[in-house]
């Protein structure tokens, strides 16, 4: 009996490990595709830098130079985004953000980022707004439109 219990704990541990691996694997971006807010703010405020295409895929407000694509959770908005992106070179630096809430709760970033993956973009990033646009961008005094 005692031995059996140990075994089931081991199996449970493996199960949890496996589950967390699946959850991590599921995101359409990898850690290298997360762009820190400060890094983007530095580029935006430096006219000598090539400017990325910044796309807001949520309702949170426009970062300086960003274009509004409306919430990507809606199919119609996602199709408009596809049309807009089809005019860009696949090597264009693209930064998407939502900023409505933490990533785990956000309905907009996954469809938008997955679209960039599917379309074969090579230099696309997700702005790493860990909480929201207000806390991670506006409150830090980074530039807005």
Q: Language-model features: where?
A:
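Flexible, polar/low-complexity N-terminal or interdomain linker segments that lie immediately upstream
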Residues: 2-62
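Second-shell loop/turn segments in exported
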Residues: 28-31, 67-71, 99-103
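Conserved beta-strand scaffold positions in the cores of enzyme catalytic domains, especially
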Residues: 34, 54, 66-69, 124-126
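Alpha-helical scaffolding within the catalytic cores
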Residues: 38-43, 73-85
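Sec/Tat-exported extracytoplasmic proteins
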Residues: 44-48, 98, 120, 141
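Active-site neighborhoods of enzymes that stabilize oxyanions during catalysis
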Residues: 60, 138-145
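Acidic/glycine-enriched edge-of-secondary-structure segments
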Residues: 62-76
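Catalytic cysteine-centered active loop of the rhodanese-like fold, especially the PTP/DSP P-loop
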Residues: 82-134
């Amino acid at each position: 009996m005692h031995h059996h219990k140990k075994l089931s704990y081991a199996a449970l541990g493996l199960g949890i490990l496996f589950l967390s691996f699946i959850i991590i694997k599921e995101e359409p971006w990898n850690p290298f595709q997360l762009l820190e807010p400060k890094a983007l703010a530095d580029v935006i405020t430096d006219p000598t830098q090539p400017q990325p295409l910044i796309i807001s895929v949520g309702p949170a407000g426009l970062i300086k130079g960003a274009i509004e694509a409306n919430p990507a959770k809606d199919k119609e908005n996602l199709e408009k985004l596809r049309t807009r992106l089809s005019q860009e070179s696949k090597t264009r630096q693209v930064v998407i953000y939502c900023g409505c809430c933490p990533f785990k709760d956000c309905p907009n970033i996954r469809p938008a980022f997955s679209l960039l993956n599917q379309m074969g973009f090579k230099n696309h990033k997700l702005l790493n707004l860990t909480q929201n646009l207000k806390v991670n961008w506006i409150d830090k005094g980074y530039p807005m439109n």
